[in-house]
Protein backbone atom coordinates (compact mmCIF):
# COMPACT_ATOMS: atom_id res chain seq x y z
CA UNK A 1 0.00 0.00 0.00
CA UNK A 2 1.40 3.37 -1.02
CA UNK A 3 0.13 6.36 0.91
CA UNK A 4 -0.19 9.96 -0.18
CA UNK A 5 -1.27 12.51 2.41
CA UNK A 6 -1.78 16.27 2.32
CA UNK A 7 -1.53 18.48 5.39
CA UNK A 8 -1.47 22.21 5.94
CA UNK A 9 -2.87 24.12 8.90
CA UNK A 10 -4.02 26.91 6.60
CA UNK A 11 -7.41 26.44 5.02
CA UNK A 12 -8.29 27.33 1.47
CA UNK A 13 -4.98 26.34 -0.12
CA UNK A 14 -6.47 23.60 -2.33
CA UNK A 15 -5.68 20.38 -0.45
CA UNK A 16 -9.16 18.90 -0.90
CA UNK A 17 -9.47 19.91 -4.55
CA UNK A 18 -6.00 18.57 -5.34
CA UNK A 19 -6.74 15.25 -3.64
CA UNK A 20 -10.09 14.91 -5.44
CA UNK A 21 -8.50 15.39 -8.86
CA UNK A 22 -5.48 13.20 -8.10
CA UNK A 23 -7.80 10.37 -7.05
CA UNK A 24 -9.57 10.51 -10.41
CA UNK A 25 -6.28 10.81 -12.33
CA UNK A 26 -4.71 7.81 -10.58
CA UNK A 27 -7.92 5.81 -11.07
CA UNK A 28 -7.83 6.65 -14.79
CA UNK A 29 -4.27 5.26 -14.81
CA UNK A 30 -5.62 1.95 -13.50
CA UNK A 31 -4.58 2.39 -9.86
CA UNK A 32 -6.88 1.26 -7.06
CA UNK A 33 -7.60 4.31 -4.91
CA UNK A 34 -8.84 4.57 -1.34
CA UNK A 35 -9.76 8.11 -0.32
CA UNK A 36 -10.15 8.75 3.42
CA UNK A 37 -11.92 11.96 4.41
CA UNK A 38 -10.69 12.64 7.93
CA UNK A 39 -11.39 16.39 7.83
CA UNK A 40 -14.26 17.32 10.18
CA UNK A 41 -15.69 19.59 7.46
CA UNK A 42 -16.10 16.52 5.19
CA UNK A 43 -15.75 18.61 2.03
CA UNK A 44 -14.07 15.76 0.15
CA UNK A 45 -17.04 13.51 0.86
CA UNK A 46 -19.31 16.29 -0.41
CA UNK A 47 -17.33 16.40 -3.65
CA UNK A 48 -17.60 12.65 -4.26
CA UNK A 49 -21.23 12.03 -3.23
CA UNK A 50 -24.52 13.45 -4.48
CA UNK A 51 -26.87 15.48 -2.27
CA UNK A 52 -29.29 12.54 -1.77
CA UNK A 53 -26.36 10.26 -0.85
CA UNK A 54 -25.10 12.84 1.66
CA UNK A 55 -28.55 13.22 3.20
CA UNK A 56 -28.79 9.45 3.69
CA UNK A 57 -25.21 9.22 4.98
CA UNK A 58 -25.61 11.96 7.57
CA UNK A 59 -29.27 11.35 8.50
CA UNK A 60 -29.34 11.23 12.32
CA UNK A 61 -32.24 8.74 12.14
CA UNK A 62 -30.22 6.34 9.97
CA UNK A 63 -29.35 3.49 12.31
CA UNK A 64 -26.54 2.20 10.09
CA UNK A 65 -23.72 4.75 10.21
CA UNK A 66 -21.64 4.51 7.03
CA UNK A 67 -19.14 7.29 7.78
CA UNK A 68 -15.75 7.29 9.48
CA UNK A 69 -17.63 7.64 12.77
CA UNK A 70 -18.86 4.03 12.55
CA UNK A 71 -15.45 2.39 13.12
CA UNK A 72 -14.49 5.11 15.63
CA UNK A 73 -17.62 4.69 17.75
CA UNK A 74 -16.28 1.85 19.96
CA UNK A 75 -13.09 3.86 20.63
CA UNK A 76 -15.01 7.04 21.46
CA UNK A 77 -17.36 5.16 23.80
CA UNK A 78 -14.42 3.32 25.42
CA UNK A 79 -15.80 -0.08 24.40
CA UNK A 80 -12.83 -1.58 22.61
CA UNK A 81 -11.20 -1.28 19.24
CA UNK A 82 -12.23 0.06 15.82
CA UNK A 83 -15.24 -1.40 14.07
CA UNK A 84 -15.57 -2.39 10.40
CA UNK A 85 -14.57 0.28 7.89
CA UNK A 86 -17.44 1.51 5.70
CA UNK A 87 -16.55 2.11 2.06
CA UNK A 88 -18.52 3.93 -0.62
CA UNK A 89 -17.87 2.79 -4.18
CA UNK A 90 -17.34 5.96 -6.21
CA UNK A 91 -16.02 4.37 -9.41
CA UNK A 92 -14.56 0.97 -10.36
CA UNK A 93 -11.14 1.96 -8.94
CA UNK A 94 -12.15 4.50 -6.28
CA UNK A 95 -13.46 3.79 -2.78
CA UNK A 96 -14.20 6.44 -0.17
CA UNK A 97 -14.17 6.30 3.61
CA UNK A 98 -16.78 9.05 4.06
CA UNK A 99 -16.11 11.90 6.41
CA UNK A 100 -18.51 13.12 9.05
CA UNK A 101 -19.20 16.52 10.56
CA UNK A 102 -19.11 14.87 14.01
CA UNK A 103 -15.46 13.89 13.55
CA UNK A 104 -14.45 17.05 15.42
CA UNK A 105 -15.71 15.36 18.61
CA UNK A 106 -12.92 12.77 18.22
CA UNK A 107 -10.17 15.41 18.36
CA UNK A 108 -10.39 15.63 22.16
CA UNK A 109 -10.00 11.83 22.39
CA UNK A 110 -6.82 12.07 20.31
CA UNK A 111 -5.27 14.82 22.43
CA UNK A 112 -6.06 13.03 25.69
CA UNK A 113 -4.73 9.72 24.36
CA UNK A 114 -1.46 11.24 23.15
CA UNK A 115 -0.31 12.04 26.70
CA UNK A 116 -1.49 8.66 27.99
CA UNK A 117 0.70 6.91 25.42
CA UNK A 118 3.70 8.17 27.38
CA UNK A 119 2.34 6.13 30.31
CA UNK A 120 2.07 3.12 27.97
CA UNK A 121 -1.69 2.79 28.35
CA UNK A 122 -2.93 0.35 25.71
CA UNK A 123 -6.30 2.08 25.05
CA UNK A 124 -4.39 5.27 24.28
CA UNK A 125 -2.36 3.50 21.60
CA UNK A 126 -5.58 2.10 20.10
CA UNK A 127 -6.98 5.63 19.96
CA UNK A 128 -3.93 7.33 18.45
CA UNK A 129 -3.50 4.63 15.81
CA UNK A 130 -7.20 4.25 14.99
CA UNK A 131 -7.33 6.44 11.86
CA UNK A 132 -4.29 4.69 10.39
CA UNK A 133 -5.82 1.28 11.13
CA UNK A 134 -9.12 2.34 9.55
CA UNK A 135 -7.21 3.15 6.36
CA UNK A 136 -5.41 -0.22 6.50
CA UNK A 137 -8.71 -2.01 7.01
CA UNK A 138 -10.33 -0.17 4.10
CA UNK A 139 -7.36 -0.87 1.83
CA UNK A 140 -7.68 -4.58 2.60
CA UNK A 141 -11.31 -4.76 1.44
What are the roles of these predicted feature ranges?
Residues 1-141:
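P-loop NTP-binding core
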Amino acid sequence: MKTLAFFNNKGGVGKTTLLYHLAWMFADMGKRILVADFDPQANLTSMFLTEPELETLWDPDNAEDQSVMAPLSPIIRGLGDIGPTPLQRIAPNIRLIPGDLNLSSFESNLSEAWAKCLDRQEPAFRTTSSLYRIIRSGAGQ
